[in-house]
Curated annotation (Swiss-Prot):
InterPro entries linked: V-ATPase_116kDa_su
GO process terms (BP): vacuolar acidification
Signal peptide: none
GO cellular component assignments: plasma membrane; proton-transporting V-type ATPase, V0 domain; vacuolar proton-transporting V-type ATPase complex
Main location: membrane
Superkingdom field: Bacteria
Organism: Borreliella burgdorferi (strain ATCC 35210 / DSM 4680 / CIP 102532 / B31)
Name of the protein described by the UniProt record: V-type ATP synthase subunit I
Biological function: Produces ATP from ADP in the presence of a proton gradient across the membrane.
Record bears the keyword Cell membrane: yes
Family to which this protein belongs: Belongs to the V-ATPase 116 kDa subunit family.
Transmembrane regions: 308-325, 327-346, 356-376, 405-425, 438-458, 464-484, 495-515, 517-537, 550-570
Length: 608
């Protein structure tokens, strides 16, 4: 349910604005309209939080070090020390990387002393280092004016030195000049490694502060939020400051009483058309299980749109079962849910909607898999446990089962899409002009007619023979949409003329409705693909498992485990791609849902 909101303006004396915001934050229900203004204290808070986050990112969970839960130390100074150490470590790591690169360049020519080369140079013996294409080196050997010595060939490159009484210029080769030799670099690397070890040891001693810094970052998140709201407060004639926002209508009286006690004023009003109103959704029961899904997708309905959580979860239950399609996978999900729940309960943490979602979807997969007799995609399971056969539904497993499942897919599609238009009808019939809602009756007629047409074209023309009445239902439905779809309360016939301007759009929308029904066949197709994958890996592993060779048996176990883990991962991905899509695209399009909302984020103090 989307909660009704009220617009609120809060006015206080400028000298008391900090105290007023503290009271407002303690109340914890007002969504503040942010202006993203700046202030010195806000900048400082953001900079301090950035230092804390940098320090936290440099620390590691260390099982050998007991993490401190509290400390009287200055956390910011500790964080700065960690960041400085981190910068020093990065600096030495860069030096090490540069030295290793230099060593790789020199090592091709072998170990030599630059001092010896300089001494030879003083005696007019010049040694130079070059590299060249292997084919070009052979040509270079034919030049009588060049005295060269091959050091090494690496792939298609020749590394060589030239020796002479003067410096030579070999234009077809690349010359290398070195500042250090291998001995110097190796000694330098040794020193750098020792310093790095010391620095890494020093920073590891700070790992005990990881929990404290994590809590301090959360604390600074609230400080930054408070400073941002403080900066956003607008001043009127220097004596008064005010801020605007939104509050749930159910909290209006409570807020009014709270601000009166605090000594500042509040003015309430209904939101206007152009206001960006936050969407506050209250969910209960099954609908609450949708929260983790919408949080992951980051989709929020607009304030004037509808909360589809309950319907979403009803149909998602069916979609999940048909896409996963394996009862054994459902049992695995159920066991994972139990383990996750126990881990939370043992730590004293409350269970979340996510835990309920796992159990809810597990049951879906178990039910559908049991009805189709699918357990790890293998008939051997049914042979080993004959009782499982009693759960099979003949409509889904015997003759014409494929056609029956496809029929179910299309029926689910027409049910969900029709539900969207029924919902639209009941909403529009309460609004003016009431006749606009008749277009939804037209849509219902179209969808039902198109549904029968889909059954005729895809399933069976003999089982679903086409009658003229079906075409007439579609035509009449399109006519109703055409006549009443653009009615806005002005002249009836002028609104019909507006429909002529969108006649192509109307045609495409009707075709889209046909395609939307067909798209529900993905429930069958994706489920069948998952069954085929599991069956294929089962077939591959059986000869290996029947072998008397232990190595082959182990290989068979690996094959079957890999196959089913892969299939579970692909099936879960399919649930997101296809199961969520049917709710968020096909259903939402027919409902007119644009998911254009912004989240309700009340200004409140977070519990530690």
């Amino acid at each position: 349910m989307i909660v009704k909101m009220k617009k609120v303006l809060l006015l206080t004396l400028s000298k008391y604005k900090k105290e007023s915001l503290e009271i407002l934050r303690d109340f914890g229900a007002v969504h503040i309209n942010s202006c993203n203004k700046n202030s010195d204290s806000l900048k400082k808070s953001i900079d301090d939080r950035r230092i804390l986050m940098q320090a936290f990112s440099l620390l590691k969970e260390d099982g050998g070090v007991k993490a401190l839960k509290s400390s009287n130390g200055n956390f910011l100074d500790i964080a700065k020390s960690i960041v400085n150490l981190g910068n020093e470590i990065k600096e030495f790591q860069d030096i090490k990387r540069s030295l290793l690169h230099e060593r790789n360049l020199i090592s091709v020519w072998g170990n030599f002393s630059l001092e010896n080369i300089d001494e030879l140079k003083e005696s007019n013996i010049y040694i130079q280092f070059f590299k060249i294409q292997k084919s070009e080196y052979k040509n270079l050997l034919r030049d009588p004016n060049v005295n060269v010595l091959l050091i090494k060939n690496v792939k298609n490159t020749s590394y060589f030195v030239s020796v002479g009484e003067f410096e030579q210029k070999i234009e077809i080769a690349d010359e290398f000049k070195f500042n250090f030799d291998l001995d110097y670099i190796n000694n330098k690397l040794k020193v750098v490694d020792e310093i790095l070890d010391q620095k890494l040891t020093q920073i590891s001693l700070f790992n005990k502060y990881i929990d404290i810094l994590r809590d301090e970052i959360k604390n600074y998140d609230q400080i930054v939020e408070f400073e941002q709201v403080l900066a956003d407060m607008q001043t009127d004639x220097e004596d008064f400051s005010y801020i605007t926002g939104f509050v749930p209508a159910e909290s209006q009286e409570s807020l009014k009483n709270a601000v009166l006690k605090a000594g500042f004023a509040a003015q309430f009003a209904d939101p206007e058309e152009n206001d960006i109103i936050p969407t506050y959704i209250k969910r209960k029961g099954i609908a609450n299980l949708a929260a983790p899904i919408f949080n992951i997708l980051e989709t929020i309905p607009g304030y004037k749109e509808r909360d589809i959580s309950f319907i979403f979860m009803l149909f998602f239950f069916v979609f999940f079962g048909m896409i996963i399609g394996d009862a054994a996978y459902g049992v695995i999900f159920f066991l994972i849910g139990i383990l996750l729940s126990l881990s939370f309960l043992l730590k004293g943490k409350p269970l979340t909607p996510f835990h309920g979602l796992i159990f809810y979807l597990s049951v879906s997969s178990i039910l559908y898999g049991a009805m189709t007799g699918t357990w790890f995609g293998s008939p051997l399971i049914l042979e080993m446990f004959p009782i499982l056969n009693s759960f099979k539904v003949s409509y889904l497993t015997e003759k014409n089962s494929v056609q029956n499942i496809i029929f179910i897919c299309f029926s689910i599609g027409v049910l969900q899409i029709s539900l969207a238009h029924v919902w639209n009808f009941f909403r529009q019939v309460k609004e003016k002009p009431h006749i606009h809602s008749i277009a939804q009756i037209g849509w219902l007629m179209c969808i039902v007619g198109l549904y029968y047409l889909v059954l005729n074209l895809i399933l069976s023309q003999s089982r679903f023979p086409m009658y003229n009445v079906v075409y007439n239902v579609i035509y009449f439905g399109v006519a109703l949409v055409f006549v009443f779809g653009k009615q806005d309360g002005s002249n009836f016939f002028k609104c019909i003329l507006k429909s002529f301007g969108g006649i192509i759009e109307q045609f495409l929308t009707t075709v889209s409705g046909f395609a939307d029904i067909i798209s529900y066949i993905r429930l069958f197709a994706v489920g069948l693909a998952g069954l085929s994958i599991s069956a294929s890996f089962n077939t591959m592993s059986i000869p290996l498992l029947k072998s008397s060779n232990i190595g082959l048996i182990v290989a068979g176990i690996i094959v079957i485990l890999f196959g089913h883990v892969l299939n579970i991962m692909l099936s879960l991905l399919s649930v997101i791609v296809h199961g969520v899509r049917l709710n968020m695209l096909e259903f939402s399009n027919h409902l007119g849902q644009e998911w254009s909302g912004c989240a309700y984020r009340p200004f409140k103090k977070m519990k530690k």
